[in-house]
Amino acid sequence: MKKILFLSLLILPFTGCKTNNSEWKNLILNNSLEGWHIFQDDGTKSGWTVENDVFIFDAKMSSENMLVSDASLLSNKKYLSFEIKFDWKIEKGGNSGFMWGVSEDDKYKFPYQTGPEIQILETKTYSNPKSILGGEIESNNIIEDLGKKKKFLGAVYGIYAPQNPYEGNPPGQWNSFHITIDHQNNKGKVILNGILINDFKLKGNEWDSLVNKSKFSQSQDYEYLGKERWYGFAKSPKGFICLQDHPGKAYFKNIRIKEL
């Protein structure tokens, strides 16, 4: 009996740790940016505020030239496999994104050089590309993608178009994402407002083939990225999660994560 009790006491702490790790955890704490930081911040970057437990990015408040450096918001913690839920909204013509597997090595200038992105944008820009914020570069991105939708809302940017394209709620209204990144089972998915819109692989022949057909294989181009270009793209399953800076304003709330 004493041996059984002793073994039970040994097992309890380990089972408890596993349970705690698999629980949903709130990532917005104390109405602050606690637990987050701006990408490669040296103390001079700006653009993010918190109001009533809502993260707000306003490009007009950011000190960054988005073609030179980046003010995206990164978690302090690195994640491997997880589910994440959050609500978001953007203004008319707006654009943002959620990334995972991001490296903050100073040889990279932008989070998207390493982290794949789930696209957030106003879908009406696909019928009027010039309405997207960010000027000619952003409107050309839409024009090039009109028949593919690999940059549409819920796409794995430039790689996987959503199998079930859905426009979501219009600018100024909240939308809800439930994103799964499961490396153990090689499975990712995006649920928007309760509707499954994208289901994709995270590695293997299919993933490699799609990346090879995308801009992420064109490392001879994109000089503004620096010498590393796209060589580190999607190479590290474990990394920071990221909310992207972009022209306009973007809002995020109710951010919760569960590690798998």
Protein language model annotation of sequence segments:
Residues 1-23:
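Bacterial Sec-dependent N-terminal signal peptides
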Residues 17-260:
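Carbohydrate-interacting regions of secretory-pathway proteins
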